[in-house]
Amino acid sequence: MEKIVLLGYMGCGKSTIAQNLSKITQIPFLDLDICIEKRANLSIKEIFEQHGEIYFRKLEHEMFLELLQSSENAIIGLGGGTPCYANNHLLLQRDDIVSVYLKASIDTLYNRLVHNKSKRPLIANMDEEEMKEFIAKHLFDRSFYYNHAQHKVAVDNRTIDETVQDILDILA
């Protein structure tokens, strides 16, 4: 059983990297947020609106545990906040998984997010300065949790293929 867990801030490339890694390794990619949406039969936004964040974080933790306990091989892409709640960061250090923090700078994240921020409810209504400050604060707050990953891969100034290769090197 092989579990590869990718984590990092929104815009760091978790889904894109996971999809490419999945094609190469033939290990299925599971996006935690999509798994939660399927289970709840609601979008993440609807879960937050109808049930609140505490309910969402409980669902998120349960689904993460379920995916980790599954006998299937999987590449699991976490939500940006997943490691920060319910002691999920401690799960990143389990011996039976490989956890990888896709580490991006504030500028890289900003440049990736600014053009499609309408798809990101947390930043959709922010101007450029607010957005940079928001990302900086979030990264600072979350870095403790993200850094519990077994491996860190810098994504700044790296292509998708280079980042995927960095992860393949870790797995080798």
UniProtKB/Swiss-Prot annotation:
UniProt xrefs under InterPro entries: P-loop_NTPase, Shikimate/glucono_kinase, Shikimate_kinase/TSH1
Signal peptide: none
An annotated GO cellular component: cytosol
One example GO MF annotation: magnesium ion binding
Enzyme Commission identifier(s): 2.7.1.71
Cofactor info, note text: Binds 1 Mg(2+) ion per subunit.
Names of the cofactor(s): Mg(2+)
Record's catalysed reaction(s): shikimate + ATP = 3-phosphoshikimate + ADP + H(+)
Binding site residues for substrate: D33, R57, G80, R142
Cell location: Cytoplasm
BP GO terms, sorted: amino acid biosynthetic process; aromatic amino acid family biosynthetic process; chorismate biosynthetic process
Annotated binding of Mg(2+), by residue: S15
Keyword vocabulary terms for this entry: Amino-acid biosynthesis, Aromatic amino acid biosynthesis, ATP-binding, Cytoplasm, Kinase, Magnesium, Metal-binding, Nucleotide-binding, Transferase
Record-stated family: Belongs to the shikimate kinase family.
Record protein name field: Shikimate kinase
Species per Swiss-Prot/TrEMBL record: Flavobacterium johnsoniae (strain ATCC 17061 / DSM 2064 / JCM 8514 / BCRC 14874 / CCUG 350202 / NBRC 14942 / NCIMB 11054 / UW101)
